[in-house]
């Protein structure tokens, strides 16, 4: 089950990167990890460095992707972003959530809809 969840999550992140590139975001980093926090995608859009949490769903059985980015998750993302920003200096930051919804088709995840929530928290 864990391998399945990871492959669906990876497919969602790949779809989010393609979506963001079409929207003229410059991808700076992916899967940035520190102890206690991870950021799925770090991108640049205009004057902002954007820290993006991606949630991939094949059903609403466990709630929407946006609902999964609760206060605890937000705090972990913010902590990781603070560490990342140390190497960038004084920049403006924003926190977005990208929700990728789709269906499992055989062994592949087929994207049906992408919702991008800017300034999510």
Question: For each of these PLM feature ranges, what is it?
Answer:
Residues 1-30:
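Acidic-basic catalytic patches of nuclease active cores, encompassing PD-(D/E)XK
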Residues 38, 42, 49-53, 94, ...:
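Short hydrophobic-acidic sequence motifs that mark active-site Asp/Glu residues
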């Amino acid at each position: 089950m864990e391998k399945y969840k990871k492959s669906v999550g990876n497919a969602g992140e790949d779809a989010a990167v393609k979506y963001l590139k079409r929207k003229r975001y410059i991808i700076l980093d992916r899967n940035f990890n520190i102890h206690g926090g991870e950021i799925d995608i770090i991108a640049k859009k205009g004057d902002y460095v954007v820290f993006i949490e991606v949630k991939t769903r094949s059903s609403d059985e466990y709630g929407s992707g946006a609902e999964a980015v609760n206060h605890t998750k937000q705090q972990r993302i913010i902590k990781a972003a603070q560490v990342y920003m140390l190497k960038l200096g004084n920049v403006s930051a924003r926190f977005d959530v990208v929700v990728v919804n789709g269906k499992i088709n055989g062994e592949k995840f087929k994207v049906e809809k992408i919702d991008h929530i800017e300034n999510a928290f």
